A protein has these predicted regions:
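Conserved helix/coil segment N-terminal to the catalytic DExD/H
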Residues: 6-22, 27-46
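Residue-level preference for the first positions of well-ordered beta-strands
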Residues: 20-22, 49, 79, 169
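Walker B catalytic acidic pair
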Residues: 53-54
């Protein structure tokens, strides 16, 4: 149970004002009903920039998390994605990441239209089932040109010399209000 004062502090997170508010959530929280509900309430209470780090976590167009994040992104004034992974592994992974940014960026009405433009599919038969798999990719120069209009890529060698990674575990004590919010999203 929380006190009236603690409840008021929690509710103050959702007061509409012009000050910058930052909410950091693990992308996994968007797979839960509580996480989606909390993020939705926050996004609808503030002028926000919603950024997805490691945006390849939203590459699957049928995943619940991907659908939730794309839907919530519509409530954010600004959207950004970031990833350290090269996009050359599977160009089809770009569709939902771009859809999160703006559903009109790639000018396709569906994932399947996008897939038909940039991949040749073949049918494989497996244990009495037929499945569609990518045979080869196509029109990648065109896709690359399209991406240049709204993306920015920095290679590791283009950056300053980076020191070796230094891993430090930090234990953070949450306030009662923070712990309550954290527990609600579990």
């Amino acid at each position: 149970n929380i006190t009236k004062s603690q409840q008021e502090k929690l509710e103050s997170l959702f007061e509409i004002e012009t000050a910058l508010h930052i909410l950091i959530m693990n992308v996994e929280a968007f797979s839960t009903e509580k996480g989606v509900k909390f993020a939705s309430k926050f996004l609808n209470s503030h002028k926000t920039l919603m950024a997805i780090d490691e945006s390849t976590t939203i590459k699957n167009p049928t995943a619940k998390r991907t659908k939730s994040i794309i839907s919530l992104g519509k409530h954010s004034k600004y959207r950004r994605i970031m990833t350290g992974s090269p996009v050359t592994k599977n160009p089809l992974d770009l569709y939902t990441q771009c859809k999160f940014l703006d559903s009109y960026l790639l000018d396709f009405t569906s994932y399947y239209a996008f897939r038909n433009r940039y991949a040749e599919m073949k049918t494989m038969h497996l244990r009495g089932r037929s499945i569609q798999v990518v045979d080869e990719f196509k029109n990648l120069a065109e896709l690359s040109e399209t991406l240049k209009g709204f993306s920015y890529r920095v290679l590791k060698e283009d950056c300053l010399d980076l020191p070796p990674k230094n891993w430090t575990k930090r234990h953070i004590t949450l306030s009662k209000e923070q712990q309550k919010v954290y527990d609600e999203m579990k």
